[in-house]
Amino acid sequence: MRKLNLLFLVLFLLTGLSTLSAHNLEESIASSDRTPAFATRDVYRHPHETLNFFGIEPDMTVVELNPGGGWYTEILANYIHYPGTLIAAQGSYYLEGFKKKMNSSSMYGRVELVNLNSTLAEPNSVDFVVTFRNLHNWLGADMDSIFKNSFKALKPGGSFGVVEHRAKPGTDFETMKSSGYVTEEHAIEVALKQGFELVAKSEINANPKDTKDHPKGVWTLPPRLRLDDVDRVKYEAIGESDRMTLLFRKP
């Protein structure tokens, strides 16, 4: 009887921990700490589905590459708890402003800030690296370098999650640079070259309404709306871009 009670206790604790993890993610997304304008974009960016697909857990050491204004950082900073750590690898342009953002709230207590053009973390020390809508900024040598540093920082078996504006198959390199859309083929090619294995793809962030032939590239669409009021209703109806969602693994 005593053994049976112990078994029930263990099962209860395990179930509770699993529920707590899921609840924490939901709470992190619903948190009042988030910038209201960011939260309104959940309908396009699907943070719950995306982070669940990647499999990020709150006790992991996670590197977010080039978080920019911190759209995902606000969620991850609330979600990741001791002994987990979030490392924000920020581009030089955003570093000073991001320091102020981190000093503005206690939720950034487990966030470390490093330069994107660094080694990111100690070799083989990170559980997960993620990047959201950044590859078009790195096309060329920068992308190779950042993927290489990400691979080195990850533990064997660690994961690399990528979300990026998706170009039509066969789109040439110069068009990718000017339009802000990158082909899946190119993203996968660069990752494999650095030693990653492709684990899975998801259509969580797909948008079949996006024709990808807009006058100002991906920036024609929300949230940028580069044409201002020209065809605004049309582009708002399309919504945010069609995106690939890829999961890689370090062997």
Each predicted region: which residue ranges?
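Conserved class I S-adenosyl-L-methionine
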Residues: 59-68
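Conserved beta-strand signature within the Rossmann-like core of class I S-adenosyl-L-methionine
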Residues: 157-165
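C-terminal lobe and adjacent flexible extensions of AdoMet/dcAdoMet transferase-like proteins
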Residues: 240-251
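A short glycine-rich, Lys/Arg-flanked "PGG" loop and its adjoining helix->strand segment in the class I
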Residues: 144-156
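Class I SAM-dependent methyltransferase Rossmann-like catalytic core
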Residues: 25-53, 57
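A short acidic, Gly/Pro-enriched loop at the edge of an enzyme's catalytic core
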Residues: 120-129
